[in-house]
Structure formats: C-alpha cells, structure tokens
Amino acid sequence: MDKFIQSFSHQYLDSSSSLKLTARRKRKLTILGLFLFSLISLMIIISYSNNNILPGLSGISISSTFSDYYSNPKQQNKFEQQIQDHQTTKKGKRTIIFPNNFNHVHDHKGSYMMKDSELVKYYVETMEQALDPEDLIYRNRFTYKLPNIPYTEQKIEMFSDGGGGGGDTSDSNTDMCPKLSTTIKVEASPAMNKNGDLKKILKTFLQEDSFYYRELSPFFPDLKKHFDEDTIDKHWYQFIGSTVWLEQYGVHLMVSRIIYTEKDQGSPKFSLAYLQVFDRNWKELDNVELIVPDPENISTTNNKNKNKKPYGYKSVLYPTIAPIPVYHNSKQTGGRFYGIEDPRIVLIKTRHGYEEPVLIYNSHHRKISEKHFDNDQEGKINFNNYRSLFIGWIWQTQLGKIHLEELPNNEFKKNEYIKIKEFVKPNNNRGRTEKNWALFINYNQRLNQGFDSHVYFANQLKNLKILKCSILNDNDDDCEWEFQMDDYEDAGVLHGGTELININQLLHQYDYPELNSIKDLIPNGREYWVGFARASLKNCGCGSRMYRPNLIVLMKDGKNYKFAYVSSFVGLGIEILPWYLDKGLCEHYNLIIPNGISSWTIEKDLHQKEKDKQVMDYMAFTISRRDATVDVVYVKGLLKALFTDSSSSKHLLAVEQTGFKSVTNVDCALKNSEKFCKIYGETF
C-alpha cells in the first residue's frame, strides 16, 4: 500500500509540477488513489477463479488444542493431480504455497482460522503482491509419502570402538579388527536420478540478467556460445544434491552445486548453488512460490504457537540460482575454487518456533594479513586466501557483502544477497581449507531451550574433534571446541559426507509401542547421531582415487563423544558410473559420494500385508556419481538393524561406555575399505 501511495504521489502530486495543487486537492487525490487501489484489489479477489484455490479449511473457531490440518490420502491424491495439471497446462504461472499452520488471525474479535478463500485477500492486500488469474494458490495439506520402489538386501560391516577393556587408548591396534567387527543387514533401493535440465536452468539465468548473473558472468563469458554450439553438457555439471522435507509446505527443498569448467568436471572454474522444489513424489515443481515467515516484519497473522512473537510473511520463488555473496577475482583464477562448494541444507528451529532451512558450505575468500602505510598514507595491504566454512540463511537477506569482504566495495553494497556468516575456529584460527566436516544438531539443547542456538561439526573424524558454532546472530563470533579427543591435527582420509541425524529426535517423533524397547533403554545423558562419511583412497587398486560412503554412529555420553561404529566402504548395490563415459570403471576416479540425508521416517512396513504390518524405518539420502549426478537412494531398516540387532544394540545401549580415546575402529574401517577397493579393481 505504501508503495502504491508513493507511486501515486510521485506521478500526480509532484511539487515541481506547473500545476499548483492545494492541500485540499492533494488529500482528495490521495483518497482517490486509495479507493482505486482497494477497488483493483477487490476485483482481483472477486475475479480470481475458485478453481485455482485448492479446497480445504473453512472458517471455524480455534482452541488451544488446535492441531495442523492435513487431508486424507484420497483427497491428497486428487489435489496432487490438480497441481500436476496446472504445472503442465499453465506454463509460466505460479504455484503459491502457504504453510499448513498459516491459520491464526488476531483482531478485535479474537482469534479465528483463516479460510482458504481468504488466502487471496491476504496475498494481495496484506502482502501487496500481484496475482495472475491463472496462478494456483493453496495452504499445504500434504503429508510425507514413501515411494513404492523395490529394495534389495545389503550387508554393512561395521567396527565398534572397543567399548570394553582396552578401548581407552589412542594407540591403534588393527589386530583387534576381527573382534571389533559386526555385520548388519539392511535393504536399499536403486538410485533415482534427480538432475535438472541444465540448458533450461542456464537459459533462465542468462535471460533474467539479474545482478548476480552480471556480477559473475566474467567467469563464463562464453555461455551464449555454448548454447549456439550445443556444448552446455561439456562445460556445465550439476551434482552434490542435498535436500530436506519441508513439513509445513509438503515439498522437498534441494540445493545442488552447478559448476562451470573449461575442461571437465574435475576442474571447476566457478560453482553456483541451485535451489529447487520437488513434490512428495519427487516430481520437480516449476515456478513455485513459498510463503515463508519473515521475523523482520511484525504482523497480526501468526503461527499456531500463541506464546511466540507474531511475525509476518514474505514470498520466495523457486527454482533459482541462490544469490550467495562470494569473493571472486576473474583475473586470478589459477588454483582457486571460487563460488559455493559442498553445499548442505539442514533444518534449524528458530526462536520464533518455526523450522528454517539453512545452507552450510565452503567458499574461497580472503582476509587481510598485513597493512603497510607510509607517512603519506599510501601503502599496501596483503591478504591470505582461505576456503572457509559458512552458513547461509536462505529465507533471509543482507545488503552487500558484509561478513565476507573487509574492504568497502560500492559496486556490491546495494545488492540483496542471502544472509551469511563465517564459522571461525577458536582464537580466530582459520584453516587454509575447511572441507572435512560432518554437521549435526544437538536435540537435547533444542528441547531445553525450545530452539537451536548452535550447530555442531565433527571437524576431524579420526582423533575426533567437535566444533560448536552459534547461529543466534550474524556476528563473526569464534566457534568453540565442544570436544577434542587429543591434540593431534590431521584431516586424514575419512572425510565428512552427509549431516548426522539425531536418533533421539527420530524416536521422539513417533509413539509406536514397538519403539519403547529402544527408548526405555537409552541411558540418561546419552545421544546418538547416524550418517555417512566418505573415505578418499588414492591408488588403492581402482583408478587414481576411490570414494564410497562409510556409515558412522556418533555417540555422546555425558560430555564425551566417540564414534561407536564406523563401517568399511558401503556399496548398497548402487550402480557405478565411469568418470569418462566411454572408458572403464577404474579409469581416473571411481566414486559414490554421500551428500545429505533427505529424511528418516518410521512407518508401517509398506511391503507387508495389512494384518502383519510392523514398524519399519526408511532413510532417504542423496549421492553423487562421477561428479555429475544428483541421486536419491532409500535405505530400509537401518535404525532397526542398529538398535534391535543383538550385537550392535547391546553395545550402543550399554550403560557403561569406554573407548573415548580409541581410533582403532576408524583404522579398521579404512583398512577394510582398501581391501574393498583392491578386490573391486581386480573384478573390473
């Protein structure tokens, strides 16, 4: 409304105009402008087709016992078809999704539930957004859905920390490997490829000609030429996908890395972060607008938690190349990896009570190392270069490159980027390269505080070190050490892969009676996290380098942390793609890289008869193959195998724990991974 009034006043009430308007006439014209704006808004609301509002809630009073509304499975299938029809037949039109808990309106009458039909009015009048008659708008009513896919049985060999006598020593003893070994059985699906249409993505980036494209285009000046010569697939690659399930919106949100290279996918010149949305069936949705919380905008519309401070909403559009501020110099590219590396997406719970997706990534930047000035105030500034760890709040923004550039730069100060912050080790101790980390959230801290105040990193996987970093503000505060096994520092060959999922949180989300046997046995003060690391083995018997996932189980007992289990290479029956499509599997790199855990749910087993159904857990995680794919793999029964199998569960749930100084299980896992590589090379 303010924008409309300003525009109206500028056009009709310019004081420099030859037409001298009286104050009375100005007021009349202002009133006329307000009337016209209201009339136009009303016409949009009235004329907007009810066919483009998915039916659902009606206006009913709400109470403290209000629970989020979701449609039944039959209705959800019907709504899904409507959305897919709209995506297919209304190209270029938006699909606008309000969160499921967008329900409370507070006014002089009290609180009531906003009708679905009122979403249009809110969007046009309160948010002051334009609406096309063919746009589709709805409040989410979709719940998570497992795909109906085949599974095959797979074995995973793991090595425990020793747990019992002799486990608390940093001296590795691989003679113990057979004794520490245990094998679990899970089931895994084939890899489902989710790569986007790079030609479409880059064409949109080129045609939109955003400030971000104009800023970075010197790194890929031949983009138009690549279209003309049809060589996009020789210079551009998409990989390293990481996703989260947005429960309030009923969609998967994915970030992936898109690189430009002059040679092949192993020599990137610049990296971009690409954000896109998939429905619950893993079908990509185009031109999707999510109505997300905006804590900077206080509003009378709130989420269901009446104890939280009211906040407004704003819209974010997907798919998009994320405008993340990065340091770059197109005149100095040798040996530098500019842009966004290894992006991971994770959900944090904010102080306002809602879940917010954030990105964790590495990026090349510089920091001032020395300043030299003479008496005439002329001098020289020296810089050190780093590949550091950052967080990006993708639903929040900042102007310019604060928290990145130390020198003022007027060229970028008015650009609106995603809000970022660098994570720095204690005592401002930046490592030259911060790439080998595994992210996790402390669930007990969330329960005690009601929100997440920190994120945690397994910063070094062998001779374990845990870093704790604040996310409550955007100040460049130093992180602090949560745990250090010892003073040994070396990244080693076991690197971070996916984030780690908190098992306590996973169990807490479900009330199946079958889970009580696990919940009741978890000792007080004990937390578990599970995810996939990745070992990088050079010249081990297949190509110059082999990567595979390594399952890891992180345990916290009191104030101490350890890897209770580390597995050798895990294949999971996933098809391998050769680095060079016209050559063998052991030419150059042979890899499966785990990137992120998309979801982990506990359901009634879909593959059993109704009367025989038991609870089963399903993990979805993303991988990359040949640094050129974005794939999703489902693993069935991993939680069950870890916590109900007689061997592993006995160790994980034991009250007395040792092994907090042991690295033997890591060495055993790496030793057997090398054996895996050698046998694989002899086979292929």
UniProtKB/Swiss-Prot annotation:
Record's subcellular location: Membrane
Cytoplasmic side, ranges: 1-28
Glycosylation sites: N297
Keywords: Cell wall biogenesis/degradation, Glycoprotein, Glycosyltransferase, Membrane, Signal-anchor, Transferase, Transmembrane, Transmembrane helix, Virulence
Protein's GO biological process: beta-1,2-oligomannoside biosynthetic process; beta-1,2-oligomannoside metabolic process; cell wall organization; protein O-linked mannosylation
TM ranges: 29-49
GO CC annotation: membrane
Lipid bilayer topology: Single-pass type II membrane protein
Topology feature Extracellular, residues: 50-684
Top EC class for this record: transferase
InterPro entries noted in UniProt: BMT1
Pfam family, any one: BMT
Function: Beta-mannosyltransferase involved in cell wall biosynthesis. Required for addition of the first beta-mannose residue to acid-stable fraction of cell wall phosphopeptidomannan. Plays a key role in reducing host inflammatory response.
Record family assignment: Belongs to the BMT family.
Official protein name in the record: Beta-mannosyltransferase 1
Organism: Candida albicans (strain SC5314 / ATCC MYA-2876)
